């Protein structure tokens, strides 16, 4: 497996990966901003391809390839510490638990999205992507990596636990349009040492 930086040509696949990793939240956000006649995936793809101010901009992604084929990707960022003040009254109710957990992760490197394409799952590639994400976190100067996972996503939860991640906090998932998930959102973290 080889890793490389994301390019504008990856935007279509990255939009699918981001939505899969985000369990439909990205698609819902994109639906709010798509203009008439534009699909929400088209909006999301264009945002990843061209919005260099956005966290999900293609250059912020690491792409995993096997035999020159994209098999998965991830991106993350260092969470500001102190965390910026947020007026929760201006946020959608369903989004608040995610923001609260991100605030708890202040100072860590937050793995915002990670996913392996379906045809490559079950072969250990997620562990390799996770290890590379930990390298990126260390390179950012932090000693802790964090991530959010829905408890209903048992496969991901088992992967993170088996790789040394532990629960730090949890919040109840508030359903949003497009959502079919229930349960809690779990903030997990791992100390990376020196």
Report residues per predicted region.
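A short beta-loop-alpha structural element at the N-terminal edge
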Residues: 2-17, 22-29
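Conserved GNAT-fold acetyl-CoA-binding loop/helix
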Residues: 24-49, 60, 84
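A short helix-loop-beta-strand connector motif used in the catalytic cores of GNAT acetyltransferases and
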Residues: 48-63, 79-84, 110
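Conserved beta-strand in the GNAT
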Residues: 63, 69-78, 110, 115
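Conserved acyl-donor/pantetheine-binding loop and adjacent beta-alpha core of acyl/acetyltransferases
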Residues: 78-113
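C-terminal "cap" of GNAT-fold acetyltransferases
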Residues: 93-94, 143-146, 150-157, 162-163, ...
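Conserved GNAT acetyl-CoA-binding A-motif
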Residues: 107-109, 121, 130, 137-148
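Conserved acetyl-CoA-binding loop-helix of GNAT-fold acetyltransferases
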Residues: 116, 122-139, 158-162
């Amino acid at each position: 497996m080889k890793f490389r930086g994301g390019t504008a040509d990856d935007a279509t696949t990255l939009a699918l990966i981001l939505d899969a990793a985000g369990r439909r939240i990205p698609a819902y956000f994109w639906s709010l901003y798509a203009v008439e006649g534009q699909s929400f995936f088209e909006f999301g793809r264009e945002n990843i391809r061209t919005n260099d101010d956005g966290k999900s901009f293609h250059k912020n992604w690491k792409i995993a390839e096997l035999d020159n084929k994209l098999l998965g990707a991830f991106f993350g960022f260092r969470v500001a510490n102190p965390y910026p003040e947020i007026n929760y009254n201006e946020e959608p109710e369903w989004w608040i638990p995610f923001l609260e957990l991100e605030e708890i992760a202040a100072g860590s490197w937050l793995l915002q999205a990670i996913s392996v394409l379906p045809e490559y799952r079950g072969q250990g590639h997620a562990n390799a992507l996770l290890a590379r994400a930990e390298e990126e976190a260390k390179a950012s100067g932090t000693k802790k990596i964090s991530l959010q996972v829905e408890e209903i996503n048992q496969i991901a939860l088992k992967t993170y636990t088996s790789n040394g991640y532990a629960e730090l906090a949890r919040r109840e998932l508030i359903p949003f349009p497009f959502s079919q998930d229930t349960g809690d959102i779990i903030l997990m973290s791992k100390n990376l040492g020196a």
